[in-house]
Amino acid sequence: MVIMTFGSGFQIENDSVSYLQRMKALNSYAADKGIAIGGYSLLASRGAKPKDAAISHHTGYPAKTREEGSRFGLSPCIASDWGSDYFKRLKNFFHTTGMNVFENDGSYPGDPCSSTVHSGHKGYLDSQWKQWNRISSFYQWCRAKGIYLNVPDWYFLMGSNKTPMGYVETNWSLPRSYQEVIERQNI
């Protein structure tokens, strides 16, 4: 199994015909070798334009800190129009390329959002639930298509095949030699 990341030049949200055809050819090559292939998407803490961001209940502006309501920094609200487009692009990628592995970093389970203009929720009180439903529906779609999922443990009952055991983001800020010990503990 190969999970490509943006560090390798992988761009799961790139919907240009030439890129998708290149990824389709790569998938065919991998499949001929008996290798499942797919990629990674950073969803949490990726940044967002103000109109797409999870809006703080405390400030009325995009949430950037835990005090403002964000778990991992400036993140998009996946119940916004941006979120709808994001999932359309992902579905198009998998449908067009035939790749069958997906690792998603987020949404943990989505920062609450006070926006009243996002198309996928009414306001603060329903925002996290609507985001949960949107991403859970996507994961269920993936599983119905046979796509292997490595996603946060909040979604294990929504179709995840694997979830990191003992994963803590701060582990990867440690010196490399400590990271190796942690990696081996998680195996």
Model-found features: residue ranges?
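Catalytic domains of carbohydrate-active enzymes, especially glycoside hydrolases
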Residues: M1-G7, H95-V101
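Short, small-residue-rich loop/turn micro-motifs
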Residues: F6, G106-D111
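Aromatic-lined substrate-binding rim segments of carbohydrate-active enzymes
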Residues: G9-I37, G120-L125, R134-I135, W141
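Active-site-proximal beta-alpha loop/turn segments in soluble metabolic enzymes
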Residues: F10-I12, E67-P76, S114-Y124
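Active-site-adjacent "subsite" loops/lids of carbohydrate-active enzymes
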Residues: S18-M99, Y108, M165-I187
